Amino acid sequence: MLACNYLMCTVLAASFAGAVPLPREGVAFTVGLGLVSGAMYLGGFLLLQWNIARNGVVLSATFMKLGVLVPTAMAMLIFGERPGAVQMAGMLLAFLAILLINLERGSQKAASRAGLVLLLLVGGSTDATAKIFEELGQAPLKDTFLLITFVTALLLCMAVCIARRQSLTGADLLFGLLIGAPNYFSSRFLLLSLNDVPAVIAYPTYSVGTIVLIALLGVWLFHE
């Protein structure tokens, strides 16, 4: 299913990237960052799977969402963003909401704290590549950056599936393709938003918005 998800993301990214002429400047940086981002996309998911098996869904989901601390801190410490009082209050409320929404589902002890911390760092670093590109990359290459990211994730995911000898079912294909569209557009809109919205606001809002959307889909589709 994950490979089908990345396949849909790749197709959508190619459709946007193919419509824009590419500047020569910044191509090497875009490709390099895209390769790193794609590898981290898949690595973060595999790490999430491992943590769910060791630490349970609640703690794993919480630390994955708290990964927004990484790009938020990076924006302040490296790129010099300084949130105002209202923005700082909004950030704190967003992080509090993440904790409350996830930890409300139950409490359990971590079997591997190091695994949870690594999940937070990898997930947050993956999201941070969008801010790095926004600061250091060429804006006309943003769709190329996403294309390289998802092509890399797709190829690596296919390699993992082959190594594990996993078969593809009709359900995997259907749900993977359905998940791929919102996955791609959420990444694209995050990248676009960073042009106009400070990262210290964009990332916490993006994370909380994802949680709310998943919750609404759970109510609508599964009557949770």
Report the location of each language-model feature.
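Polytopic alpha-helical membrane proteins, predominantly small-molecule transporters/carriers
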Residues: M1-E224
